[in-house]
């Protein structure tokens, strides 16, 4: 799906950056600072990751001037590392949206109890294990893996490189592996960050109807064993949902948030990005969560229904109490 590698000098030229180091190094992946290793390139655009920069094992890093003294590996100096990272993802994504594959391999899967419904499209290099059933109108992209005895309802879309474990159930019209909300600001417009990661559903996961699970920008969005989603749940890029957690309808979880094991999250909740919710937490419906929850318990945040004038008075009193 993606070109395998580039020379560091090629990357520097593509970005219009200033290379410090060995331009002949081969770069095959983009990774976060802590995950990066030999053959990968990373980036830093926020000072809170300065310690990660100092500890990185990346072959090279995209940096701005303020981080030069903290970088112990080869680097490419650029004006805006976040924008340059976005452009680099576009380079690595290659021909992702430049052509459409019309070759359907659905007829290749007719043994081991596998059943493929009418008008199902299956891309190349797909692995479908025994006993799996895929209903009419579903789309299975290139390089997808589907574990044994999984049941896929009609009109499900699995984007390229998604991995589905054993005995999963995916209900109608759900989309797994779409891009997350990722853009870098370049002053007068937004530069798209191509999402080079994937989605991994472990074993015994159930996804309700019309859910969306976005692929990771790098790495994987993960739903661990036994996770259950109600209808119309949104899981953003790079989230990690702990095993046996249940999430009610129309809840939306923003990017890179980690939900612990055995949590119960009611319907209609909103959970912001980059927070962590501890194991065993219960969240009542319509709660808006803006910070990490560090101890188990039952949490609520919805407001009671009042006439609007009374609601305004109620909120004003509450605000004064918190201000005091």
Question: Where do the PLM segments sit?
Answer:
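Structural signal for interior beta-strand "rungs" in well-ordered beta-sheet cores
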Residues: 43, 104-307
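Terminal amphipathic alpha-helical/low-complexity segments used for targeting or macromolecular assembly
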Residues: 1-107, 162, 167, 173-174, ...
